[in-house]
Amino acid sequence: MFEKFTKEARRAVTLAVDEAEIRGDSRINTEHLLLGVSNTAGLGQLGLSPEPLRRQLDRLDAEALEAVGIDPRLINEAVEDSRPTVKKRGHIPFTEAAKDVLKQALREAIELKDRHIGVEHIALALTTLSPKDRAVRALDGIDLDPAELRVSLIRALRKAS
């Protein structure tokens, strides 16, 4: 399937892997794909930029810890102190949800009669996720409505073709 991805879409997936490594996560999930997509050119004009999303994901992490009575600052300090200096950890697997997003990106491209899967198709696939998904919650947290983002993405794709 990756042979159908544009250069920029492949870059977004590579950036998602990098985001998982940076965050110290053991698997690549939907929020990593969202961060990867937001790091590519062209989607910033739609309000999709990485720094606000990273801050929102950090807030979601902190809220989850606080919900079970853990002080997030103590966890952050412990993690920073114990994090190894080695950057690459080898293969990081994709979660089923992240794989489903990539499959949905293919379906989005087919539905729009596009020959290749671009960053926009991955972003469109992310807008189809459940409201409980961390990627959707991150979008909501920066006041980006997934349905409105979807309309803007489709409009941009139609304008480009």
Which positions does each model-derived feature cover?
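Histone-fold recognition with a strong bias for associated Lys/Arg-rich disordered tails
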Residues: 1-161
